[in-house]
Amino acid sequence: MVVRGAPAIGVAAAWGVVLAARAGDDLDQAIEGLRASRPTAVNLSWALNRMQSCDAAIAPIDVGQLERLAAAIESDDRVLTQALVNHGVGLLPKDCRVLHHCHTGAIATAGVGTALGVIVAAHQQGVLKHAWVDETRPRLQGAALSAWELGCCGVPSTVIVDGASGLLMRRGE
């Protein structure tokens, strides 16, 4: 996966449509090619549907209009992820410990990240005591990406094997 994280995939797809339009490619074909690249990614289909609706509404193709829509999709993701983080931090008790699975950080979105963004913000606001990060097999997104992002932000964290999460929860850690 070159681009991973549902929000980032949607944003990349929107800009992919813009690049196809600039190149003079058949947009329906380009959109279907992008859609087939990761058919289970909800944001991919959502962004491509928005871009396709814009394309269908204008003839001839207005690249500027497509660029504005792609920029709006990217901007919306920034705003929505920040709102999610702001709300999520308010739900966490002081000195909490959290268990994070997979990767939901800033490099998976156009903004600050989703669940991992909440963890980083909780650390910055003095709410978080520790983050446990599942390795997330088979691609190891937790060990490779989440742990890296948390380390870059100075968040105290420990990578654990996926099977250890049940033990941590049983112990109340």
Label the model's feature ranges:
Residues M1-A59:
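Long amphipathic alpha-helical segments
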Residues M1-I9, T40, V98-V112:
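Glycine/serine-rich anion-binding loops at beta->alpha junctions
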Residues A13-A21, L48-M51, G88, A115-A122, ...:
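Buried hydrophobic packing segments
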Residues W15, L34, T104-A106, E135-L140, ...:
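Acidic, glycine-rich active-site loops and adjacent beta-strand->loop/helix elements
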Residues R35-R97, H101:
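C-terminal binding/interaction regions
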Residues W46, V98-H101, A108, V133-D134, ...:
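General beta-strand structural signal in soluble alpha/beta enzymes
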Residues A110-V159:
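Glycine-rich phosphate/diphosphate-binding loop of Rossmann-like nucleotide-binding domains
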Residues V155-E173:
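Glycine-rich phosphate-binding loop
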